[in-house]
Amino acid sequence: MKKILLTNDDGYHAKGIKALEQALEEMAEIYVVAPKHEKSACSQCITITAPLRAEKIKGKEGRHYRIDDGTPSDCVYLAINELFKHVCFDLVISGINLGSNMGEDTIYSGTVAGAIEGTIQGVPSIAISQILSNKNKNTPLSFDLAQKIIQDLVQNIFTKGYPLKGRKLLNVNVPNCSLQEYQGERITPKGYRLYKKEVHKRTDPKNESYFWLGLHPLEWQKRENEDRLSDFDAIASNHVSITPLNLDLTSYDDLKSLESWHEGMLK
């Protein structure tokens, strides 16, 4: 039977990872290693300055752990190299994240980082996120569409094989809409996220300042002369966005121009 490792950045008890497990439990043998506490926007952080403690969850056949103060990258690293080192995983899936991970957010994202760590460890990996809107943050959220998408995607991978070669992963974003409103899937490039420079300054009872970094509205810049919808555009039209991501961040188009610019200094 196929074996899938799940993680997230919302924490072991988050609704998204439970929905993910429910969606896949009849398709594969599921293992879960997730942070004990929320680690949103922790990026590819891995813990090397403090010990990590792994708590085995009772009643889960020894396949569930939560990592005290661990990040998604910690969780995947520990799962593959120690906790389940005798298990050959077919997939690592990180999610279902509560909120989008598109454009430059993929660099900040702990969810995407979990899938990146799986890729680094040589396992085909997927990050999946459920878009939220301001109006529904405090209302019940349905994962029906996200569950359907991940089931279809995993089944396709099990049938056809993983579609990417080398150090690459899939980043999936699911729109905040019903199955009836859903318009299909699009293979997309990353868009350009627009950020506001918000910092919220507050004063505590001791009259000392503290700060909250601003939560930015989901705004983006339209790509010019682009035949494909970006991930943002796809979501805005109730499409699921599937984006291939490459761990190699080298800007190959600029290598020659940089050599020319640096001419005379290179030895």
Curated annotation (Swiss-Prot):
Offer one Pfam family short name for this entry.
Answer: SurE
Subcellular localization, as worded in the UniProt entry = Cytoplasm
Q: What is its EC number?
A: 3.1.3.5
UniProt keyword annotations, A-Z:
Cytoplasm, Hydrolase, Metal-binding, Nucleotide-binding
Q: Which GO terms describe its cellular component?
A: cytoplasm
Instruction: Supply one GO molecular-function term.
Output: exopolyphosphatase activity
Provide the cofactor list for this protein.
a divalent metal cation
Q: Which residues bind a divalent metal cation?
A: 9-10, 40, 97
Q: Per the annotation, how and in what number is the cofactor bound?
A: Binds 1 divalent metal cation per subunit.
Concerning NCBIfam families, the annotation shows: PRK00346.1-4, PRK00346.2-4, surE
* UniProt-listed HAMAP family: SurE
This molecule's function is given as: Nucleotidase that shows phosphatase activity on nucleoside 5'-monophosphates.
Q: Which family does it belong to?
A: Belongs to the SurE nucleotidase family.
Q: What is this protein called?
A: 5'-nucleotidase SurE
- Write down the species: Helicobacter pylori (strain HPAG1)
GN (gene name):
surE
